[in-house]
Amino acid sequence: MVKARRQAKILELVRTRVIETQEELAAALAAEGIPVTQATISRDIKELQLTKVPMPDGRYRYALPEEPGAAAGERWRRIFREAVLTIDHSGNLVVIKSLPGTAQGVAAAIDHAGWPEMIGTVAGDDTVIVVVKPADATGEVAERLKGLMR
């Protein structure tokens, strides 16, 4: 039970605070009445699949895997930002123009997002078509995708 309580507290701390190091995490846990060793912290970080993600100031903090700034998600966003040139939509389709040879990566990034309104992607060399359902959500999906370009 102690491990479950400790790991739940770690998740809470990582969600609510900027924790940059294992030492900071250990200190935060100790302040909550949960003393731990560095080895325990290290095991918990691995089991909880915490990752380090960059902050705007260049420092890194621990994050949960599903957080928007987490490692895999950040890689997909970076691919999207660097490759996408334009986004437009018509009917239930969003058309994305990208740099030559990057459409497959862009489509994979979109698929990774897992938005329920996007039912599939088709990628060529420099164009991705996103099929949206329901059709009246297409404009919103296009705007959300444009937001990933920033």
From Swiss-Prot:
Belongs to the ArgR family. PANTHER family: ARGININE REPRESSOR (PTHR34471:SF1). This is Arginine repressor. Regulates arginine biosynthesis genes. The keyword Kinase does not apply. The gene is argR. Keywords: Amino-acid biosynthesis, Arginine biosynthesis, Cytoplasm, DNA-binding, Repressor, Transcription, Transcription regulation. GO terms for biological process: L-arginine biosynthetic process; protein complex oligomerization; regulation of arginine biosynthetic process. It is found in: Cytoplasm. The lineage of its organism: Bacteria, Bacillati, Bacillota, Clostridia, Eubacteriales. It comes from the Bacteria. Its main location: cytoplasm. GO terms for molecular function: arginine binding; DNA binding; DNA-binding transcription factor activity. One of its GO terms (cellular component) is cytoplasm. Pathway: Amino-acid biosynthesis; L-arginine biosynthesis [regulation]. NCBIfam families: argR_whole (TIGR01529).
